Amino acid sequence: MIEDTMTLLSLLGRIMRYFLLRPETLFLLCISLALWSYFFHTDEVKTIVKSSRDAVKMVKGKVAEIMQNDRLGGLDVLEAEFSKTWEFKSHNVAVYSIQGRRDHMEDRFEVLMDLANKTHPSIFGIFDGHGGETAAEYVKSRLPEALKQHLQDYEKDKENSVLSYQTILEQQILSIDREMLEKLTVSYDEAGTTCLIALLSDKDLTVANVGDSRGVLCDKDGNAIPLSHDHKPYQLKERKRIKRAGGFISFNGSWRVQGILAMSRSLGDYPLKNLNVVIPDPDILTFDLDKLQPEFMILASDGLWDAFSNEEAVRFIKDRLDEPHFGAKSIVLQSFYRGCPDNITVMVVKFRNSSKTEEQ
């Protein structure tokens, strides 16, 4: 009886080894477990994936910091590696911009302030060009000045005006786009640009966005508050609009309108504008400064956001507000060493209620 039992167990063991330990069986088992985890434990899987990504970002960031500190003595001697750099510094605003690994510099920025007389709210702009620098340069050189003039007129008779910061922003952005399209169409220049504009007054912050440059604010509690939302072709609202216009989106490294443009709204881009698949309409948001009591805001081209999340960027800058560029230079270099291939432009604006900021 015992011998029969042992023989049976031995036979079962051989059968299990033959079937269960075969490579094909193990492969199918792994696939089944993966599918089961995906469909029945989606949240847990997402958490694990997100944690893994954050860990990789953290390691890459630490390596980047070591590289920054070891290369030729630190930050102040790295400019030669970036081909070209640009910077701006005021008492509460700092900008740092690099050409990076690109052959051409297509980013532009502008700062217009009148803190003494306050004839208009402060104007901050980021313009990330594509298909050449023509569009970004055109918008940078004309839109802020046009806004300044209209805002000065508005401030003189604000109480009786039917306008607002939002309507002025929308009117001037659309006007500049129409004006630029006429000129670029004649010269067959297909360049385009993003447009991120922030108007800062005593009580309000108004932000207009076209494209995928982005603004983020750090509130009194250290939270990252989005000031804008990227216009991307894969978003449901944008995808439906593009389809209604007779267009399509396809994946070529990223989702693109007509297989060409990686954003669904822009200024310029006359061939896609003629098809009505890309539009210049800005999204405009207004924020109550008394309620948020912000410490600083970040306005940046997508070169930064390809390397940093909103929350990570806020934490990074918050720890470096005492630096000469309020952390703008450090985060640009960090993005570069994380492998960003694009032009990178970062503007940091400190608010007057920040304990580290002078009277605005």
UniProtKB/Swiss-Prot annotation:
GO cellular component, one term: membrane
Annotated residues for binding of Mn(2+) 1: 128-129
Gene Ontology MF terms in the entry: metal ion binding; protein serine/threonine phosphatase activity
PROSITE patterns the UniProt entry points to: PPM_1, PPM_2
Residue stretches making up the PPM-type phosphatase domain: 92-351
Presence of the UniProt keyword Metal-binding in the record: yes
UniProt keyword Transmembrane helix present: yes
Extracellular side: 1-25
Key words, A-Z: Hydrolase, Magnesium, Manganese, Membrane, Metal-binding, Protein phosphatase, Transmembrane, Transmembrane helix
Annotated transmembrane regions: 26-42
Cross-referenced CDD domains: PP2Cc (cd00143)
Catalytic activity: O-phospho-L-seryl-[protein] + H2O = L-seryl-[protein] + phosphate; O-phospho-L-threonyl-[protein] + H2O = L-threonyl-[protein] + phosphate
Membrane-protein topology: Single-pass type I membrane protein
Function statement: Acts as a suppressor of the SAPK signaling pathways by associating with and dephosphorylating MAP3K7/TAK1 and MAP3K5, and by attenuating the association between MAP3K7/TAK1 and MAP2K4 or MAP2K6.
Family according to the record: Belongs to the PP2C family.
Protein name as catalogued: Protein phosphatase 1L
